[in-house]
Amino acid sequence: MTDDKDVLRDVWFGRIPTCFTLYQDEITEREAEPYYLLLPRVSYLTLVTDKVKKHFQKVMRQEDVSEIWFEYEGTPLKWHYPIGLLFDLLASSSALPWNITVHFKSFPEKDLLHCPCKDAVEAHFMSCVKEADALKHKSQVINEMQRKDHKQLWMGLQNDRFDQFWTINRKLMEYPPEENGFRYIPFRIYQTTTERPFIQKLFRPVAADGQLHTLGDLLREVCPSAVAPEDGEKKSQVMIHGIEPLLETPLQWLSEHLSYPDNFLHISIVPQPTD
């Protein structure tokens, strides 16, 4: 992979200032103060909210506490979506800090998966990494790794250790020089305007004539509504890690540098702000 390490670091250390507030109907023994935290964009809510859980449990009776879950403006937050994706999709046009409501009751069974422990997060994460490598390398790279390498990937993410993670992840971002890129680009496109969870299709980083495909090429093929016509008004923002990449950016470069730790490009399509 091309070594733009500053880009990798900027992506890894992206943070979202967040204010956690206990839901008003939760029963407490005294007033629950809000809890402020800088959330890592690349991580998952269930990995980084132990302090939030302990903070609010201090003012609650044990019998009033069940499985914790989070909500933003009425929308339950999926723990298996990376934090940065959740923010870009649901709150990118709102003022900071991001205001998240904490619940300990009335778990929304229809909207969220249960997360009994961090092992569930690890299993989901590794499943995504393996799926991504199947697309990129026919699973050859991930299958050649030892179990300790898989564990190092996970521990690097869980403990927020950039070098620990990238020592292993770098292998997943390599490809034979004669091929100019991966077999297929692991991506998922999310929209707030549809009930469909996401769009995911097979898409090669290099065209048949050898030209590098761009982000715009991908969108025009799989989600044309996200791209404004040449003479038309821009109605959508295309966001990855809180930024709007140029549509001319090569997809291979984006996959190497702006993928989340699960090795997928998580692309949010949100309405263009009106102000």
From Swiss-Prot:
Gene3D superfamilies named in the record: 3.10.20.620, Autophagy protein Apg5, helix rich domain, Phosphatidylinositol 3-kinase Catalytic Subunit, Chain A, domain 1
PTM-bearing positions, type N-acetylmethionine: M1
Any GO BP: response to iron(II) ion
Keyword field contains DNA repair: no
Covalent link (Glycyl lysine isopeptide (Lys-Gly) (interchain with G-Cter in ATG12)) residue numbers: K130
GO CC terms of this entry: Atg12-Atg5-Atg16 complex; autophagosome; axon; axoneme; cytoplasm; glutamatergic synapse; membrane; mitochondria-associated endoplasmic reticulum membrane contact site
Membrane topology: Peripheral membrane protein
Subunit structure: Forms a conjugate with ATG12. Part of the minor complex composed of 4 sets of ATG12-ATG5 and ATG16L1 (400 kDa); this complex interacts with ATG3 leading to disruption of ATG7 interaction and promotion of ATG8-like proteins lipidation. Forms an 800-kDa complex composed of ATG12-ATG5 and ATG16L2. The ATG12-ATG5 conjugate interacts with RAB33A; this interaction is bridged by ATG16L1 and promotes ATG12-ATG5-ATG16L1 complex recruitment to phagophores. Interacts with TECPR1; the interaction is direct and does not take place when ATG16L1 is associated with the ATG5-ATG12 conjugate.
Role noted for this protein: Involved in autophagic vesicle formation. Conjugation with ATG12, through a ubiquitin-like conjugating system involving ATG7 as an E1-like activating enzyme and ATG10 as an E2-like conjugating enzyme, is essential for its function. The ATG12-ATG5 conjugate acts as an E3-like enzyme which is required for lipidation of ATG8 family proteins and their association to the vesicle membranes. Involved in mitochondrial quality control after oxidative damage, and in subsequent cellular longevity.
Protein name, as recorded: Autophagy protein 5
Species, as recorded: Rattus norvegicus (Rat)
Gene: Atg5
